[in-house]
Amino acid sequence: MFGALGVLAICLGVAACGASSKSSTTLTIGGWGGVIDEATQKAYLNQFDAENHLTSQFVDAPGVQLARVEAQNQAKQIQWDAVDSLDGGSAYTLYAKGQLAPLSASTKASFEQQLGAQKVTPFGFSHGSLGDVIVCNTDKMKTCPTTMAQFYNTKEFPQPRMFGGIEPIEAITTAEVAAGMPITQTATTPVNVKAVIKTLEGLKPHIKVFWQSGEQQQQIMRSGEVPLGIMWSDRAYQLISQGVKLKVVWMDGAYEPSYWAVVKGAHNSASASKLLAFIASHPKSEGTWAEIVHDSVPNPLALNYLPKSIGSQLADNPVNLKQLATPNFLWYAQHSDELNTAYENFLRG
C-alpha cells in the first residue's frame, strides 16, 4: 500500500538506532522500507532503543510480509520479532494461522483504553491506516458522487472510472455499501461473494483502469485519463498538495488499516511487545510519524501534535473514521482463497 520498491534487508546500525554499542539484543522488524522505515526510526526507535539498550533493524518486505512470515514458519526459523504496518487482510490471515502472537488480556485492555477499542485487535493495533475513498477531478466534473451508491450509479455518473485491481476485501466492501449495507455492519456481516461480484459487474463497463499501486492511481488522475475513481486517501491528498484539483469524499469509503504485531515464536518477543506498548503510549511520537508519512496513527491524542491541515486528512480522525466501512477481516481470514479467486475471475472476465 505504501508503494515501496524491492525487498531489501537493512540493518540501520547501532548509531542510527540510537542504542548503546554494548547492546546485545537486536530487534528485527519486518517493514516497508523507504519513508516508512525512516519515520519509524525517527519517531519511535531512536528513543525506544536508547531507553532499552537494544538495537533495532529492518528487513524490508513491501507487500510480501505475509509470505515472509509464512515462509519462516514453514522453515521453523522465525527471524522477525515484529511487523510494522502489516495490511489488514494479511494480519488477520496470519493470526488465524497462529503466526502472530496474541495480546494478553491486560495488554489488550490497556491498548483499548489508550487507543479506543476500534483500533485494537487480538494481536495488535492499527497503524499507518488510510481510507479507500471516492475522488473526482473538479476540473472535469461539476458534480461528484457523495455516497458509494452514487459512485456505483452509472446512469447518474456515466464517466469512466478507476478502481482497485488489488486488495479484494477492500474493493468488495465498497460494493456491499453501494448495495445498501450500513457501514456499521460491514465488519461483522459475512460476505456474500456472489452478490458483491454481481454488484461489481454492474460497475465494470465504466471502469477504464484497475490500478495496481498508489503511484498508478496518481499517474492516472494527474493525467486526466479518468475524472473519477477510488483512491487511497493519502495518495489523493498528495495530488492536491501538488495542485491537482480533486474532491475527496470520505462518506462510505472503505477503512484500510495496517497493524503493528509481534510474530509468534519471535526470539525477542518481550522486547517487541514492549515496543508496541511504547508506540501506543506516545501520542507525540505518533504525531511525528504521521507528519512524515501522512498516514494515520491510532492514539487520538496524536492529533494534538499535528497541524490541522494534516490531521484532517487522516483516516483515524474521528470525523473521517465514522464515515468509513470496515471490511470483515475475520471472515476474510477464513475465506481469502474463495474471495481472491472470485475477484481474479471478475477482473479477467
Whereabouts are the PLM-identified features?
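Bacterial signal peptide processing site
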Residues: 18-20
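Early extracytoplasmic/lumenal segment of secretory-pathway proteins
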Residues: 23-92
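Extracytoplasmic ligand-binding site segments that recognize negatively charged/polar headgroups
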Residues: 32-41, 78-225
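A ligand-binding cleft/hinge motif common to bilobed small-molecule-binding domains
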Residues: 89-93, 222, 228-245
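Periplasmic-binding protein-like
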Residues: 130, 194-203, 240-266
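A bilobed periplasmic-binding-protein/Venus flytrap-type ligand-binding module shared by bacterial periplasmic
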Residues: 133-140, 176-180, 257-271, 288-291
